């Protein structure tokens, strides 16, 4: 009789142990799934957070300005060139320097290949300004004031980079990322690249995915090499024989001196 009384008790104890074990395992599984889901959501959120800057019609241009383009002959430009609202007389490139179309607001631009398209240029310049505002307005930078504004000899990763004052590039730098990775650089002051300095892409990074928003004047030193689209609030000066794999989009003027500019 005692044995019969003990058996139900033992059965209940075993059932409780099994239930407890199962519950604990289930909790571990749920926790693991939750952690994995949270990480995945964070990863997806990070990727969605930084989108490329939409250039609109400005994307079609290698050089686009509001107040003219000066030039020391010869330069070699691959991509369209335009200036607006200033007269085409302020665009001082020759037709044989441009592999693309030269757009002006009037008949004063260089002949014989100049195309007059005031409405199209108005749209492109408006899109350029919108793109600048977009890039400048991106918040929550991944990297803030790297190198205290002096970034020679370092490798920059994809993401949103911000400098709250001037930026100097005194020696070579590297941009390391995949083919689809986006780089956005916000510079609150001037941007200066020293002479003979090179910007080098690694890991499949592409110039078309690199955007530099600069509040102050931009100076690219003699024989330097630059990668990406420059969205300048003021002027962009490209010194003697410097090269650019990207775009020069300036809200004032661009100055050239025997340069090679190639739209990505």
Enumerate the language-model features and the residues they cover.
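Solvent-exposed adhesion/ligand-recognition segments of exported proteins
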Residues: 22-264
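C-terminal motif of bacterial Sec signal peptides marking the signal peptidase cleavage site
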Residues: 17-20
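Bacterial N-terminal signal peptides that target proteins for export
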Residues: 1-9
């Amino acid at each position: 009789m005692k044995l019969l009384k003990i058996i139900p008790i033992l059965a209940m104890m075993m059932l409780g142990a099994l239930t407890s074990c199962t519950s604990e395992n289930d909790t571990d599984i749920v926790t693991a799934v939750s952690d994995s889901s949270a990480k995945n959501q964070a990863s997806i959120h990070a990727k969605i957070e930084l989108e490329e800057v939409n250039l609109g019609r400005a994307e079609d241009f290698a050089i686009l300005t509001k107040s003219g383009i000066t030039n020391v002959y010869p330069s070699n430009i691959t991509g369209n060139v335009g200036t607006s609202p200033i007269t085409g007389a302020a665009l001082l490139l020759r037709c044989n320097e441009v592999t693309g179309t030269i757009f002006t607001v009037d008949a004063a631009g260089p002949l014989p290949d100049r195309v007059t398209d005031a409405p199209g240029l108005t749209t492109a310049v408006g899109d350029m300004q919108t793109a600048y505002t977009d890039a400048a307005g991106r918040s929550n930078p991944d990297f803030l004031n790297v190198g205290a504004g002096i970034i020679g000899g370092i490798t920059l990763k994809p993401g949103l980079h911000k400098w709250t004052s001037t930026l100097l590039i005194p020696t070579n730098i590297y941009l390391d990322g995949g083919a689809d990775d986006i780089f956005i650089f916000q510079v609150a002051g001037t941007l200066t690249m020293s002479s003979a300095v090179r910007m080098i892409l690694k890991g499949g990074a592409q110039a078309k995915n690199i955007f530099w928003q600069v509040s102050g004047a931009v100076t690219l030193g003699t024989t330097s090499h630059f990668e990406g689209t420059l969205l300048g609030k003021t002027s962009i000066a490209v010194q003697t024989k410097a090269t650019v794999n990207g775009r020069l989009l300036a809200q004032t003027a661009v100055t050239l001196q025997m340069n090679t500019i190639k739209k990505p």
